[in-house]
């Protein structure tokens, strides 16, 4: 019986060195070693692993030994080198052992000659690097922009920002992979193949490990519960990140603008706003994005893909998180409650935005005019006013819009769709915001109260307009004549005096109107509706103007 030693294949750690490795490095080491020995076992069924007084992988990871699979032990004498003892009957030649060793080296650690930027990346756990990380050093450097990173995984993510998500046509991705299974799964990141599907919600994944982790969100007990909002989590890391939303602990601070963030991922995304880097470009319309998530979300606007369906109402969504938030409408689950006014919300985003109505925080400021905004989406729409960028164009009338929300609302003026219906009176609405304001008429809920005169309002828009009556602020200025207005809608109507635009056209007689109010009054001429009645003569008129003129001449 001959023994084959794998010192030139496996990484040799002492037990003291092993104790210094973090969990991610241990997991990587375990996965590589297990696959290596599975591959070796497939070469010969008689493979056996022997150690004297050793500490096993199961002891280190707290896992039970499988009956179907023999897992190697760490040898004694303060070494984690592996020794293979196998019956070499039929395989006893020296050439066979040489070939076997070469085979294991190739399978275990594929050496990378250099990725697309010329740097070599070696993915084996390295104790020296680990000690550097502990000392606060950042040993991984990008050769393209010289940015340094603490972890290899961070460098790899950063490298993708230079090349985009996909390799150029006809070229293969040259990123280094430890073993064939990692290389195979990495290939899926380039092809976007996601063959592993969750049976509970339909979400798909590129790797079985991601699916296994996701399944726990459906089945596993959530042991970490937040005392403030009673939200529960599977993992301690997720729980810790959530707690920061209550404590306002923001450990990641931008040195350029001073903004602080709860999550490192959010901080990294923010840093790209200073560099202006947008590596993800849409092949359909040419629009570029800073983040891959935003790029993927945008792509679905072209494909119309909505793989996530609500089982209760049949509504479909492009994103799983949007489906989860939607499900709370059916369950009535409102996890986020405001301590100031008691209002509860189904989504964290809505809750954070609501809190700013109490604090007055407007973190998004326009560099051109100094105007500040509560929401990033509103800020982006405002910026397009300066750049005159109009991404959304109506195919029916040619009108263009700076925001998708305004564009969708405009489309409903053509289709007549009013998807929001009041359950109390049956009235329908084109906009969700208008619907919410209407509901408050029934509930008599008035969230916004003026400190100057005590008047209360059901909508923030009406409240903001009212405040301008006290301050005299008129932020909307006509570029042609310099006249200023309190409301943006008033400015739009005024601009039509200069352009002569008449967007409201009567389908019955072909007449066009500049203003929607004039158009409505005209429609009543066709329908015969007379909603304005004179109290003195009990005579009705189709519009308020005619009633007012009649009253002035007769009374």
UniProtKB/Swiss-Prot annotation:
Residues 4-76 form the KRAB domain. It comes from the Eukaryota. One of its GO terms (molecular function) is zinc ion binding. It is found in: Nucleus. InterPro entries: C2H2-ZF_domain, KRAB, KRAB_dom_sf, Znf_C2H2_sf, Znf_C2H2_type. One of its GO terms (cellular component) is nucleus. A zinc finger (C2H2-type) spans 140-162, 196-218, 224-246, 252-274, 280-302, 308-330, 336-358, 364-386, 392-414, 420-442, 448-470, 476-498, 504-526. It holds the Pfam family zf-C2H2. Keywords: DNA-binding, Metal-binding, Nucleus, Repeat, Transcription, Transcription regulation, Zinc, Zinc-finger. GO terms for biological process: regulation of transcription by RNA polymerase II. May be involved in transcriptional regulation. Belongs to the krueppel C2H2-type zinc-finger protein family. This is Zinc finger protein 57. It comes from Homo sapiens. The lineage of its organism: Eukaryota, Metazoa, Chordata, Craniata, Vertebrata.
